[in-house]
Structures are given as C-alpha cells and as structure tokens.
C-alpha cells in the first residue's frame, strides 16, 4: 500500500462513464461470471439497508441513486493515488505530514530496504493530473448497495505498508504486559512505548520493550553502514506546501524509512559519500517519485529562518528517534506469552537475538510445543486466497548487522498456514524468501505457495540487487512448483508521480528481463507487477502475465456496508475490463480494513463526525469480511488480504484523528486474534 491521498478514479478517456446513460446493461452481464457474489436480496435505495448482508444483497434497484453526476469542484480533486500497502508517512503521519523533514525522507520510496528510504526524496508532486473519480457503486453492479453521495475522487492520506515493515513479531517470551488485554489494537504511543533502546545491547529484537526509558536511540556510526548515502537534509518546506490534505506529498517511503533508516543517519547529518552507493533516484531511470523543487531550504528571513532550522532540528530528532526506535524495536521471536507451559522455560527470557533464539529453542519445526500451540487455533479459518506478508527485520542494510530470525518466520508461517495457502512477499533482501521456504519445509506444509516479490526502486543498485537475488532463489530452489509467480515492483507507477510514462517503460523492461531469464532456465512462472487499480492500462496489461491491483475501500471513504460491493465494482471497471479478449488473470493484490483508529471520508476531506465515511473498527472489519470473504470464496475471486498481523511500530505515524496505521492486522503483534474479531468460517469451505 502506498502514498497519501489514495485516489480511485476511472482511467483516461473514460469521462463518458460519468453518466448512467453511458453505462449499459451489457457491462453488467459482461462480468456476471466473475462476480464474487450472487444476486439475491433487495436494497432500500434510500438508505442502503438490505434484507440480507453481504455482496449478494443488491439488485438493480440501485439505479435510482446513480443519476447524480455533478461537475467536480477542483478543490475536491486529489492530486495523487495510493494504496495502503507501502506507506508510513504523509498528512496522516506525525505532525500532519511532518513538515518538510520527514516528508523529504519518506515521500518517494515507501517500501524500500534500509538506506534507500532516505535517498532521493522528493517533494510534493504538483503536476500529477487530478483524478476523475466516480463512485463505482451503482446499477450495473449485480450486488452493489445504493451509492453513497457522489464523489469524483476517493482520496485519503495514508501512511502504512504491508512491506514497508514486516508483520510484527516478538522474541520468544517477550513481555507484552503493556499491551491491552481487552483491545491491544487501540493503544496509543504513550500507552505502548515500543522500544527501550538502551536495553537493546544485542540487537533490534525487543519490539515491545519501550520508549519508557530515558535512553537515547542506539548510537549509529554511518561509516559502518553498507551502501550509506547522504543527499543532505532539508529542514523545512516552503510556505505553500502541505496546506491541503488532498494535496499531501506522496508518503510512499515512510515504511522504508522506518524500517531501514539506521543505514542512512550519516546522510542526515554528514556530508556526501560515494555517489555510486547512494539510494537516491537515478536520473533518467524513469521511477523518480516526484518533484524535488517542492521542498526547498527556507529563504533568508532572520528569525523565520532561525525558527525554521530550530523546528526542523526538533522534528528531525523526533522522527529519527521514532524511526530508529521502530527499526531497532523490531523483534525476532515469539510475539507474546501465548506459548504453552510445556515450552522451554528459557524462551521466556526478556530479550533474544536471532542467534540466541536458535540457541535456546533450536530450529523450530512442527513438533515444537510452541509451534503445535500456534497451529491449533480454532478461531482461524483458511478462507483467504492469499495474504500479504513481510517478515520482521528484513530492511537492508540493517539486517546485515541485526539478522532477522528464522524461528520468528517459522512462527508466523505456523499461523499463516491456518489462514491461507498463498503468501505474497514484497522483496528479496535479507534472505526473507529463503526463510519462508525453510519455515514451510520445517512445518512440513504441503499446500503452501509463494508469490515472489521483487522491490523495484528508482535506484538501479537496489533493483539490480533484488532481481539478482530473485535469480539465485529460483536457481537454488529444490522445487519450483512452490512458487506461483514473481511480482516485479509494487506501486512503482504511483511513486513515479507525473513521470508515469518513463516509469512504465523502465518497469516493463525489468519485467521482460525476468521473463527472459525464466525462459532461458525453462522456468514456467508468470511475471507480474502490482499497482493502483487506475494505474493499469493496455500497455502494462500486455507486458504482465497477471493484472494485480491494490484496492482499498477504506481510503475511498466508502461506508463499510457498501465497501465490499464498491471494491468489486472498482476492480471490474479498472482492471477486469482491461483484460477482455485476453487470457490474462486478474488478482486484487491488496484489500483490507483497519480495526481501529478513526474514520476516513475520502477526497482528502475532514469527516463531519466520527461515524461518517469509512470507519475503522473491529465491528466494521467483521462487517467487511462478512460481506466479502465467503462470497469471494464461493465465486472464485482471487485476492490477497492485507494483512495478518498488526505492525505496532507504525504508531509513530498516527496523527490527529487518523490513528489506524498500526491496526490493519487480523491479529495483534503477539499473534492473538483481536478481541471481538471473527474470521468467517464460510460453512467449512476453505481456500485452495
């Protein structure tokens, strides 16, 4: 997921769709065979209340509400598109966008590894064409509720990511006494300090230790960081930036900055290092993420300039401390105290590194008492076709100093195997793919598949490293059949800003290279990329073997009782339609709902009250799953759920009334199902 101001709109040239008269019933029938729900109960067109719940609760009566098509006010058009799989910064972040400093760090490289997050940061993209959004609920959807009040764009400032940071994990026996016993997803930064950096003598493995200590973040010597790059640090934005929520700077790199910022502190405080090792955008690479000119040093102005530097320094200290703490607070072992009493008592120690975890607990497998307990949760059901996943601690180059834990990945996979047979990864750094493969082997899981992920960056060094590691993984694999395919890049076009044409060319070249390598090795695997639904066009469809779109109704401001239908309709109109006449498969690569933290009304607008628009909450998450999961399972709709586990370190990016960054998991960071949350059992039917 990425970026602030996530916008949903129809693609170029589709303005005729703005009126119902231009939409024919033929479109309705065209997609009947792929609808994840079936026609059934009628809806009240005035209030959207159906006689039955679920996607199946709508008939053609919804046409009564389809007639509104006012011209959009320019002030309501968002300037960029994003999904929530990758971002951790923006207007929804600390300080309403973290004036200048953090944004310059995080607006362009959302799910990067390590130092890449800090290099080549861009400012607000002013030249991104405004999206022409259109409420896609309506008459031609066989199960769509009465559409909400018409909007021309569904924007939201978001800052979270599935792979920007991994699904949270704890060391074995790590104390989580500070987590709420009633609803751990509702705690805030002051309730749950996530790191006690002074106590982390052995590494970043106390995810829940604390900000409660007065110790400063761990000292970092930038000269010891691999691929350290320093592009300098801009202290403050110009006066006109960040004034409107709907024009917030893309926050694509927030998660990467948080996950790997330790590797670039030298760039914040020091001078230039070798340009070749920098992770800034490569001129002409075609994947640059925005317009640097939007963030400039303040003009000379006496006290104003001085105050700007002071404020900048303070914000820099706060953000760096939070980010470093988030990275260092990353843990490797058991996420809580759910281990059985028969488990090794040594695993209840307060802190364990990856090496210590293995030394104490051995290489966990299906016969380990701890694993047996994790794999026997009657409240988990295998009803998700796929789940997005990134292990904790795989930010490069931080992982070179603090390696992620194999046992931690094995614990995660023990849980994930009860939810899905299909896991999507986002990158190849830090042996994350190899650890997942090892976990599957140790757990003796026979039906789990993996979508390989390759992070594509504006910096050729990063992309090259990721692709080369993909080749090594494939070459070393004992059985290629465990892989479902390779996803080359996630939301690379979104991060390209206005330079989508050049970015698309670069992205397609990378995809073609991977295809050529597979062909040379006689490997029959599809090669795809994932991006916003409205970033797909015929050219990209032709290049990809599978069309993968990230679609999040929450950031469209869609009320939850209409969210499932809206998601399906948006996917149909933006993605499925592009594959007509081809044999291309379509997959929703990210979809989910946060369990708490406020509400989003889309368009970058402030909600008039706490119940307007899309409301985050456990009840709402239950409703979205109730309306989506089993119907999609029955009808074969292929998607990846975002996500399995909360990522509590992201709490540093919550701000104001937008406090959902750390609350997208079905489970808390200790792998406990959230209180009150109910995963549908779909009558015993399971995903295959």
UniProtKB/Swiss-Prot annotation:
The gene is btgC. Belongs to the glycosyl hydrolase 17 family. Glucanases play a role in cell expansion during growth, in cell-cell fusion during mating, and in spore release during sporulation. This enzyme may be involved in beta-glucan degradation. Active on laminarin and lichenan. GO terms for biological process: cell wall organization; polysaccharide catabolic process. GO terms for cellular component: cell surface; extracellular region; fungal-type cell wall; plasma membrane. This is Probable glucan endo-1,3-beta-glucosidase btgC. Residues 1-91, 126-148, 168-195, 334-363 are annotated as: Disordered. Residues 329-688 are extracellular. The chain crosses the membrane at residues 308-328. The active site is at 491 (proton donor), 590 (nucleophile). It is a single-pass type II membrane protein. It is an enzyme of class 3 (hydrolase). Its main location: membrane. Residues 341-355 have a biased composition (Low complexity). Glycans are attached at residues 408, 431, 459, 609, 635. The keyword Glycoprotein applies. Its EC number is 3.2.1.39. Residues 175-188 have a biased composition (Polar residues). One of its GO terms (molecular function) is glucan endo-1,3-beta-D-glucosidase activity. Keywords: Carbohydrate metabolism, Cell membrane, Cell wall biogenesis/degradation, Glycoprotein, Hydrolase, Membrane, Polysaccharide degradation, Signal-anchor, Transmembrane, Transmembrane helix. InterPro entries: Beta-glucan_modifiers, Glycoside_hydrolase_SF. Residues 1-307 are cytoplasmic. It catalyses: Hydrolysis of (1->3)-beta-D-glucosidic linkages in (1->3)-beta-D-glucans.
């Amino acid at each position: 997921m990425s970026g602030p101001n996530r916008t949903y709109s129809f693609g170029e040239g589709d303005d005729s769709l703005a009126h119902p008269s231009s939409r024919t019933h033929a479109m309705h029938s065209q997609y009947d065979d792929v609808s994840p729900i079936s026609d059934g109960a009628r809806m009240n067109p005035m209030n959207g209340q159906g006689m039955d719940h679920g996607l199946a609760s709508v008939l053609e009566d919804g046409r009564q509400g389809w007639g509104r098509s006012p011209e959009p006010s320019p002030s309501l058009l968002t300037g960029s598109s994003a999904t929530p799989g990758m971002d951790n910064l923006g207007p929804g972040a600390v300080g309403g966008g973290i004036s200048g400093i953090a944004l310059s760090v995080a607006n362009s490289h959302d799910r990067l590894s390590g130092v890449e997050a800090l290099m080549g940061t861009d400012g607000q993209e002013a030249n991104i064409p405004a999206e022409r959004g259109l409420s896609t609920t309506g008459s031609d959807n066989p199960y769509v509720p009465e559409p909400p009040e018409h909007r021309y764009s569904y924007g939201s400032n978001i800052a979270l990511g599935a792979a920007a940071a991994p699904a949270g994990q704890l060391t074995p026996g790590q104390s989580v006494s500070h987590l709420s016993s009633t609803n751990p997803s509702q705690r805030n930064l002051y309730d749950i300090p996530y790191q006690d950096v002074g106590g982390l003598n052995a590494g970043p493995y106390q995810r829940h230790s604390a900000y409660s200590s007065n110790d400063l973040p761990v000292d970092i010597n930038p000269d010891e960081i691999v691929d350290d790059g320093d592009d300098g640090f801009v202290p403050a934005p110009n006066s006109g930036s960040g004034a409107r929520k709907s024009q917030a700077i893309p926050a694509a790199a927030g998660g990467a900055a948080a996950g790997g910022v330790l590797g670039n502190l030298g760039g914040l405080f020091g001078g230039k290092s070798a340009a070749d090792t920098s992770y800034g955008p490569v001129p002409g690479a075609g994947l640059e993420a925005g317009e640097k000119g939007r963030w400039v040093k303040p003009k000379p102005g006496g006290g104003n300039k001085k105050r700007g530097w002071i404020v900048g320094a303070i914000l820099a200290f706060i953000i760096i401390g939070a980010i470093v703490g988030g990275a260092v607070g990353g843990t490797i072992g058991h996420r809580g105290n759910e281990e059985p009493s028969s488990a090794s008592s040594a695993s209840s120690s307060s802190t364990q590194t990856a090496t210590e975890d293995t030394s104490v607990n051995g290489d966990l497998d299906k016969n380990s008492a701890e694993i047996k307990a994790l794999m026997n949760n009657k409240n988990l059901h295998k009803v998700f076709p796929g789940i997005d996943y990134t292990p904790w601690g795989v930010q490069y180059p931080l992982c070179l100093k603090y390696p992620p834990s194999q046992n931690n990945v094995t614990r995660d996979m023990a849980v994930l195997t009860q939810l899905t047979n299909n896991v999507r990864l986002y990158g190849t750094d830090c042996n994350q793919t190899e650890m997942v493969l090892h976990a599957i082997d140790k757990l003796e899981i026979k039906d789990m598949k993996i979508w390989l992920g390759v992070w594509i960056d504006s910096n050729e060094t990063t992309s090259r490293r990721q692709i080369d590691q993909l080749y090594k993984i494939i070459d070393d694999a004992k059985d290629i059949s465990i892989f479902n395919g390779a996803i080359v890049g996630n939301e690379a076009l979104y991060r390209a800003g206005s330079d989508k044409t050049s970015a698309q060319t670069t992205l397609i070249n990378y995809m073609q290279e991977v295809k050529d390598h597979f062909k040379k090795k006689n490997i029959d695997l599809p090669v795809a990329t994932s991006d916003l639904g409205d970033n797909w066009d015929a050219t990209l469809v032709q290049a990809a073997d599978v069309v993968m779109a990230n679609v999040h109704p929450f950031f469209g401001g869609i009320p939850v009782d209409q969210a499932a239908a809206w998601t399906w309709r948006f996917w149909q109109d933006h993605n499925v339609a592009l594959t007509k006449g081809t044999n291309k498969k379509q997959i929703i690569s990210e979809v989910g709902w946060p369990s708490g933290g406020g509400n989003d009304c889309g368009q970058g607008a402030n909600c008039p009250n706490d119940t307007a628009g899309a409301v985050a909450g456990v009840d709402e998450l239950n409703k979205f799953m109730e309306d989506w999961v089993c119907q999609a399972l029955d009808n074969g709709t292929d998607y990846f759920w975002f996500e399995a586990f909360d990522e509590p370190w992201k709490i540093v990016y919550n701000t104001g009334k937008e406090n959902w960054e750390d609350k997208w998991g079905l489970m808390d960071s200790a792998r406990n199902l959230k209180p009150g949350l109910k995963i549908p059992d779909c009558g015993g039917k399971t995903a295959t």
